[in-house]
Structure formats: C-alpha cells, structure tokens
C-alpha cells in the first residue's frame, strides 16, 4: 500500500516536470522564431 502511494506521487511529480519541460522547450522555440524573424 505504502509503495503504491509513493509510486503514484512520484509519477505525478514526473508528469509535472515533463509538462514544465515541454512548455520550456516550446518557449525556447517561440523565442528562436521571434529572433530569426527580426533579422
């Protein structure tokens, strides 16, 4: 039982990190597009 809860919390934490990472990548791509568009 305890292990299952730990696993659930860990998977939730990983999901949140992946979501944040995904958003950061998208932001970087948008930034790159904006900068290349200026030139």
From Swiss-Prot:
Tissue: Pancreas.
GO cellular component term, pick one: endoplasmic reticulum membrane
UniProt keyword annotations, A-Z: Endoplasmic reticulum, Membrane, Protein transport, Translocation, Transmembrane, Transport
Location (main, coarse): endoplasmic reticulum
Membrane topology designation: Multi-pass membrane protein
Compartments where found: Endoplasmic reticulum membrane
Domain of life, source organism: Eukaryota
UniProt key word Membrane: yes
Signal peptide feature range: none
Disulphide bonds in the chain: none
Assembly: The ER translocon complex that consists of channel-forming core components SEC61A1, SEC61B and SEC61G and different auxiliary components such as SEC62 and SEC63. Interacts with SEC61B.
Described function: Mediates post-translational transport of precursor polypeptides across endoplasmic reticulum (ER). Proposed to act as a targeting receptor for small presecretory proteins containing short and apolar signal peptides. Targets and properly positions newly synthesized presecretory proteins into the SEC61 channel-forming translocon complex, triggering channel opening for polypeptide translocation to the ER lumen.
Similarity remark: Belongs to the SEC62 family.
Protein name: Translocation protein SEC62
UniProt organism field: Canis lupus familiaris
């Amino acid at each position: 039982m305890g292990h299952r809860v730990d696993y659930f919390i860990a998977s939730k934490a990983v999901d949140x990190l992946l979501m944040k990472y995904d958003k950061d990548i998208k932001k970087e791509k948008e930034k790159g597009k904006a900068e290349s568009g200026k030139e």
